[in-house]
């Protein structure tokens, strides 16, 4: 599904954000990226869809080498990669429905998108997705009227309406409270299972990674230092990943009754 070969990103300052990362993710696998600040987690995600250009190495989505594509070919392939952002990246003045449908901009012509005249099949799918995440009744609300958790659900719908093969998820819970964070992580993982999607989730909360994903990648100074199941994240292993940074501080505290409510 997704394959990274010797992926390197070196900035003009000489700082190396990624150091020859080799990674393969099969279809349907949800993977979490963990590591201290500056480890290269967000850079890795953005190198996959070339929002950040890799310095060297190759990225394959299926049989397509993304790193060798022209701009127009890359735009087509980006339709296969849904992106979910930390700060939601919604258009505040647009409605929930309009924000979701913006995920179809890569499929409809300029004038149809400019006039917001999307095919009925796209509108129907948007309603189905909003219903799945519990927001169908808010389709006509403006985005700036929503809570953080509701905004992230809209962002999830916008990514899924692209009908992607891969989800790239960058710190989806960083702006949310512990209870809502668990709800959002559970929702993302459930939707990936339902749709057979592969996903890379950059997550700051180690406990969320341990709770919800099948596989964890630990990055430190741009290099992979752990690749395995969440059960393998022992205190010693986490100290190896985070170094002097207190990894326990990344774990959001939540009361037992809040965990139960998030189920």
Swiss-Prot record:
Keywords: ATP-binding, Cell inner membrane, Cell membrane, Membrane, Nucleotide-binding, Phosphonate transport, Translocase, Transport. It comes from the Bacteria. It is found in: Cell inner membrane. Coiled coil: none annotated. The keyword Ribosomal protein does not apply. ATP binds at residues 35-42. Its EC number is 7.3.2.2. One of its GO terms (cellular component) is plasma membrane. Pfam families: ABC_tran (PF00005). Part of the ABC transporter complex PhnCDE involved in phosphonates import. Responsible for energy coupling to the transport system. NCBIfam families: ABC_phnC (TIGR02315). PANTHER family: AMINO ACID IMPORT ATP-BINDING PROTEIN, PHOSPHONATES IMPORT ATP-BINDING PROTEIN PHNC. This is Phosphonates import ATP-binding protein PhnC 1. It comes from Roseobacter denitrificans (strain ATCC 33942 / OCh 114). The gene is phnC1.
């Amino acid at each position: 599904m997704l394959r990274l070969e010797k992926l390197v990103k070196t900035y003009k300052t000489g700082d190396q954000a990624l150091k020859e990362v080799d990674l393969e993710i099969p279809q349907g696998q949800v993977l979490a990226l963990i590591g201290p600040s500056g480890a290269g987690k967000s850079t890795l995600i953005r190198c996959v869809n070339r929002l950040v250009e890799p310095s060297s190495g190759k990225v394959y989505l299926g049989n397509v080498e993304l790193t060798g594509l022209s701009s127009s070919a890359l735009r087509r392939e980006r339709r296969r990669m849904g992106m979910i952002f930390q700060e939601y990246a919604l258009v505040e003045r647009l409605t929930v429905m309009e924000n979701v449908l913006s995920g179809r901009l890569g499929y409809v012509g300029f004038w149809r998108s400019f006039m917001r005249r999307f095919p009925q099949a796209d509108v129907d799918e948007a309603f189905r997705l909003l219903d799945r995440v519990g927001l169908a009744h808010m389709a006509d609300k403006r985005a700036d009227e929503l809570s953080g958790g509701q905004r992230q659900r809209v962002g999830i719908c916008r990514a899924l309406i692209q009908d992607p093969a891969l989800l790239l998820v960058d710190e989806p819970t960083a702006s949310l409270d512990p209870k809502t964070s668990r709800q959002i992580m559970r929702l993302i993982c459930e939707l990936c299972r339902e749709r057979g999607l592969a996903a890379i989730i950059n997550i700051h909360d180690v406990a969320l990674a341990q709770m919800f994903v099948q596989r964890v990648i630990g990055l430190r100074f741009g290099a992979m230092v752990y690749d395995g199941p969440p059960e393998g994240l022992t205190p010693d292993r986490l100290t190896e990943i985070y170094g002097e940074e207190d990894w326990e501080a990344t774990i959001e505290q939540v009361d037992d009754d809040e965990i139960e409510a998030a189920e």
